[in-house]
Amino acid sequence: SFAGKYELQSQENFEAFMKAIGLPDELIQKGKDIKSVSEIQQNGKSFKVTVTTGSKVLENEFTLGEEAELETLTGEKVKSIVKQEGDNKLVVNLKGITSVTELSGDTLINTLQKGDDTYKRISKRI
């Protein structure tokens, strides 16, 4: 189960990736050192994911395999389908960005890819 709270431990390529997806420099500078906390609630195939970064809260609810409206890092709402691969991987495509969330023990690894740009977030269960 993905359920739990996870605190960001490290991230790779944050600034370059955020620039590539069009986030303004001011927001990139504000966000680069903030430790975000992700909370995942899971009930069978239904998920609620809340990511709190400072005062910004990003909340998405979805059911695996069904279309849902998801909010992206840039605040846009995009209709997409989250799929599960194996026991420990969630995959979704949001407007050209592929997001893979993988659970390995108490470590949650989220990799976002757009073209040649990749951004990786590593969080630990708290």
Swiss-Prot record:
One of its GO terms (cellular component) is cytoplasm. The keyword Cytoplasm applies. Keywords: Cytoplasm, Lipid-binding, Transport. One of its GO terms (molecular function) is lipid binding. It is found in: Cytoplasm. SUPFAM superfamilies: Lipocalins. Pfam families: Lipocalin_7. It comes from the Eukaryota. PROSITE patterns: FABP (PS00214). CDD domains: FABP1. Belongs to the calycin superfamily. Fatty-acid binding protein (FABP) family. Binds free fatty acids and their coenzyme A derivatives, bilirubin, and some other small molecules in the cytoplasm. May be involved in intracellular lipid transport. The specificity of axolotl L-FABP differs from that of LB-FABP. Forms a beta-barrel structure that accommodates hydrophobic ligands in its interior. This is Fatty acid-binding protein 1, liver. The lineage of its organism: Eukaryota, Metazoa, Chordata, Craniata, Vertebrata.
